[in-house]
């Protein structure tokens, strides 16, 4: 088996599973992109095997500490383990993330379940090569009627992979209506954002909605309206939602009608909306923006963006208002995000206390030693009157 030898002090020597290009001392056996390679230290000790791609900044991703090939039995076993974990954890098996990349030992593989449909992404060269085998294993293990390939994520560019959307097994289901936390959503597995719905925020909708009764709510970066819908159904006195994307605005309005709730929907840039002088006060403001950075090298700009966003939002918060805010970039550490939030609140001259932190649900598990698997950070803050 071809392979790589890593430099001293490489992260993989300390529990990480990735090998960056700068950490490779040398290669041997002429490894080919998409192949399984041996990963060794400078003393020729095997550290495990990983998938290889010289076109990616992450040249190797370890998926086993022992010698292991990628074959049908391997994929079936890993997917069975992923499904069993979620079932034992009490996850809702008809609406959840079935496979979450490195967190389930399948680097680059994402599989989301929407009733009878499974939506699959294979965002690494090796896994993309085996996508039909993976799809067959998913259908066999879950009993899904169809498996849809949604390989249109921008992360594929860094892997040198083409964009592709197709039905791998069964027939295209068309838009599906799903229910989550008492809220009905229309999901389009073939054309919706990402795989169709933000499954990682379903629990957060309920948490935030628990504070919405009797409050005027502003949901920023509303997307399909998850937070806005949950707050409206929970008894908010009014709900306003701001979203810039026309497709999302259309979906949001449709979901509001589907759930029989009144939401004031504004198609606008959130930063522009927040800085307008005629904005009213709100008792509950939700900030759930898309990732501000896809690269660690842009972290300073991202943190400035978070600081500015929270400074603007805090100025619209009522005396005893609540702010629920989220960051979905794994490049931004939790402490960095909290510091940016605190700086923004300071700019707005607002003192706030932390009510709770919100993390990823159990169907998006975090691997110790691999901080990149922990991307979702949430804070619920309450304004301190008289400060």
What are these regions (language model features)?
Residues 1-115:
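Non-catalytic accessory regions of SAM-dependent methyltransferases
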Residues 238-243:
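Conserved SAM-binding motif I beta-strand of class I
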Residues 99-112, 128-197, 206:
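Non-catalytic substrate-recognition/targeting regions of SAM-dependent transferases
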Residues 214-223:
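Conserved class I S-adenosyl-L-methionine
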Residues 245-286:
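S-adenosyl-L-methionine
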Residues 224-236:
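Conserved SAM-binding loop of SAM-dependent methyltransferases across substrates and taxa
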Residues 248, 283-312:
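Mobile active-site "lid"/loop adjacent to the S-adenosyl-L-methionine
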Residues 281, 322-387:
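C-terminal catalytic and target-recognition region of SAM-dependent MTase-like enzymes
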């Amino acid at each position: 088996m071809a392979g790589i030898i890593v430099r001293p002090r490489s992260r993989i020597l300390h529990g990480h599973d990735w090998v960056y290009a700068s950490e490779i001392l040398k290669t041997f056996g002429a490894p080919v992109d998409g192949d399984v390679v041996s990963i060794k230290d400078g003393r020729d000790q095997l550290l495990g095997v990983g998938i290889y791609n010289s076109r990616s900044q992450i040249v190797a991703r370890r998926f086993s500490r022992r010698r292991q090939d990628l074959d049908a039995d391997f994929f079936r076993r890993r997917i069975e383990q992923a499904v069993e974990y979620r079932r034992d954890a009490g996850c809702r098996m008809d609406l959840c993330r079935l496979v979450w990349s490195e967190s389930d030992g399948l680097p680059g593989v994402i599989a989301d379940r929407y009733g009878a449909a499974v939506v699959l992404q294979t965002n690494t060269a090796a896994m993309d090569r085996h996508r039909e085998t993976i799809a067959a294993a998913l259908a066999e293990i879950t009993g899904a009627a169809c498996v849809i390939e949604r390989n249109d994520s921008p992360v594929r560019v860094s892997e040198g992979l083409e964009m592709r959307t197709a039905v791998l097994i069964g027939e295209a289901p068309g838009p599906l209506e799903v229910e989550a936390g008492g809220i009905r959503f229309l999901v389009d597995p073939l054309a919706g954002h990402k795989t169709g719905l933000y499954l990682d925020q379903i629990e957060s909708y309920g948490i935030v909605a628990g504070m919405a009764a009797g409050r005027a709510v502003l949901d920023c970066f509303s997307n399909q309206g998850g937070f806005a819908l949950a707050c409206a159904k929970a008894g908010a006195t009014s709900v306003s939602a701001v979203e810039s994307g026309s497709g999302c605005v259309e979906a949001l309005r449709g979901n509001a009608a589907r759930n029989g709730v009144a939401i004031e929907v504004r198609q606008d840039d959130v930063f522009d909306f927040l800085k307008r002088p005629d904005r009213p006060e709100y008792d509950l403001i939700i900030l759930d923006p898309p990732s501000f950075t896809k690269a660690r090298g842009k972290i300073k700009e991202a943190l400035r963006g978070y600081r500015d966003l929270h400074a603007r939002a805090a100025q619209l918060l009522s005396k005893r208002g609540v702010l629920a805010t989220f960051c979905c970039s794994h490049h931004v550490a939790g402490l960095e995000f909290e510091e940016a939030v605190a700086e923004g609140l300071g700019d707005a001259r607002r003192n706030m206390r932390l009510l709770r932190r919100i993390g990823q649900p159990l169907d998006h598990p975090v691997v110790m030693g691999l901080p990149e698997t922990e991307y979702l950070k949430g804070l619920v803050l309450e304004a301190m009157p008289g400060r």
